């Protein structure tokens, strides 16, 4: 108890020195979880007007961009005004990036480059003075985890020099952060990570989906051997596992939860706009951080799709006045959930992101097999496999690679039965093969389970 109190006191002291308003903002976002939906909508409308006004007055890009469609600052009071604004694409962001900068806030601007998983890496900016960390704290609070607790990370190590690691550890002291570099994670690295976890006993394990799945698979394959699991003989379990950076399939969720003995929280964000949405312990959808971001899902006609239908994801960062990003299409696909969450929180929910537009398959007839469908192939039978990915080859043929569940290699006939829906969708246009493999490869911890060969 004393150690926890010391950690909390020092953690809060550091944040108050670094960002005096951080905990006031945190209390506000916690209270927002029970604000009425109508009040949340009204606040979002005011925030949209404010960020659009700032963008038109302070940046070089938006006045010309909106002027091209006849939109003026005074139009924000008219019905449907926001939907009239043109959508910003990755191309505009990449080619006209400097025009998005508010010169009055340049001193607080930090640059970040997206990973380019869609083939279009983009450099974007964000205001580091906003204290977006409060959305992290709110998420942890839902699972009974504190930001000053000891945490473990399966992540790419961006501080290769020893001095940088020592400085980072000193900044966080006495809170300890166990970090495992997943850039090239092997069996020895996994054993070392699990051993460190047993000693440190972190309340949270945070990581890329691919790395979490790799460690979970290792644990399950050796679950009968003494001391090989996360807790070993000590019986330690984290309070939560936090998955990020890629869609989380039902197969992966089941495997990770079984291996670590803890609920898995799926979180959605992007390099262009972090902290978009995250799950609660109900794990039925992701609550949107409506104070921070406005979400839209659009059809091919540019209009909002019906609630429950999938559409192109368009995001507006409501807080960042240093680098306003308004109605930005990030190439993901998603949808609003129809029913409210059973947890009682009033923050609206979206479904887990099912796939990017670039991950859809195109058949010879021109028919498109959507990425959001392909990511759910084993949702009805997650017990059959420990992992999978679907590959469309250059000749348009499709191969489903899967890691059989322990002791359950069903063979191609059983797999064909389980995946009869895919065969039916393809309709005989191209061959569909099923291939058991030892593991599904990941790229430095990030997992792509829908792949279209170029």
Annotated model-derived regions:
Residues 248-340, 357:
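Conserved AMP-binding/adenylate-forming
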Residues 173, 237, 259-263:
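Short, structured coil segments at secondary-structure junctions
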Residues 205, 319-428:
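AMP-binding/adenylate-forming catalytic core of the ANL superfamily
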Residues 183-189, 202-224, 234-253, 266-272:
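Adenylate-forming
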Residues 298-299, 362, 441:
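Hydrophobic alpha-helical segments, especially N-terminal targeting/anchoring helices
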Residues 130, 150-211:
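AMP-binding/adenylate-forming
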Residues 1-113, 119-132, 137-150, 157, ...:
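Nucleotide 5′-phosphate-binding alpha/beta core
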Residues 169-170, 223-224, 282-286, 451:
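Short, hinge-like loop/turn segments at secondary-structure boundaries
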């Amino acid at each position: 108890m004393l150690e926890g109190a010391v950690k909390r006191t020092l953690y809060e002291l550091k944040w108050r020195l670094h960002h005096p308003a951080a905990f006031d903002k945190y209390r506000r976002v916690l209270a927002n979880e029970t604000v009425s939906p109508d009040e949340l909508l009204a606040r979002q409308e005011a925030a949209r007007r404010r960020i659009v006004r700032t963008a038109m007055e302070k940046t070089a890009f938006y006045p010309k961009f909106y002027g091209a469609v006849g939109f003026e600052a005074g139009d924000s009071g008219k019905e449907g005004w926001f939907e009239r604004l043109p959508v910003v694409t990755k191309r505009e962001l990449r080619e006209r990036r400097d025009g998005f900068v508010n010169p009055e806030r340049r001193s607080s601007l930090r640059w970040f480059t997206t990973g380019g998983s869609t083939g279009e890496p983009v450099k974007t900016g964000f205001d580091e003075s906003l204290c977006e960390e409060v959305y992290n704290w709110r998420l942890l609070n839902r699972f009974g985890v504190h930001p000053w607790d000891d945490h473990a990370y399966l992540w790419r190590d961006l501080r290769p020099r020893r001095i940088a690691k020592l400085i980072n550890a000193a900044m966080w002291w006495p809170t300890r952060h166990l970090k495992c570099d997943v850039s090239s994670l092997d069996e020895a690295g996994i054993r070392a990570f699990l051993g460190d976890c047993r000693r440190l006993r972190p309340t949270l394990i945070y990581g890329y989906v691919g790395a979490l799945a790799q460690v979970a698979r290792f644990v399950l394959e050796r679950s009968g051997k003494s001391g090989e699991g996360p807790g070993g003989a000590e019986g330690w379990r984290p309070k939560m596992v936090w998955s990020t950076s890629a869609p989380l399939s039902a197969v992966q969720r089941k495997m990770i939860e079984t291996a670590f003995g803890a609920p898995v929280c799926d979180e959605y964000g992007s390099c262009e706009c972090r902290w978009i949405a995250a799950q609660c312990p109900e794990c039925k959808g992701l609550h949107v951080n409506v104070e921070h971001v406005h979400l839209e899902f659009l059809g091919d006609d540019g209009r909002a799709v019906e609630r429950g239908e999938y559409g192109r994801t368009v995001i507006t960062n409501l807080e960042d006045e240093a680098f306003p990003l308004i109605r930005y299409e990030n190439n993901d696909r998603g949808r609003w959930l129809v029913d409210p969450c059973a947890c009682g929180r009033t923050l609206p929910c979206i479904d887990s992101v099912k796939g990017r537009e670039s991950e859809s398959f195109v058949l010879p007839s021109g028919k498109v097999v959507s990425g959001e469908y392909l990511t759910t192939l084993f949702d009805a039978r997650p017990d059959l496999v420990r992992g999978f990915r679907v590959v469309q080859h250059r000749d348009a043929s499709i191969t489903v690679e899967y890691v059989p569940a322990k002791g359950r290699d069903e063979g191609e006939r059983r797999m064909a039965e389980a995946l009869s829906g895919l065969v039916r969708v393809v309709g005989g246009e191209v061959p569909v093969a099923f291939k058991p493999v030892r593991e599904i490869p990941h790229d430095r911890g990030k997992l792509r389970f829908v792949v279209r060969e170029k």
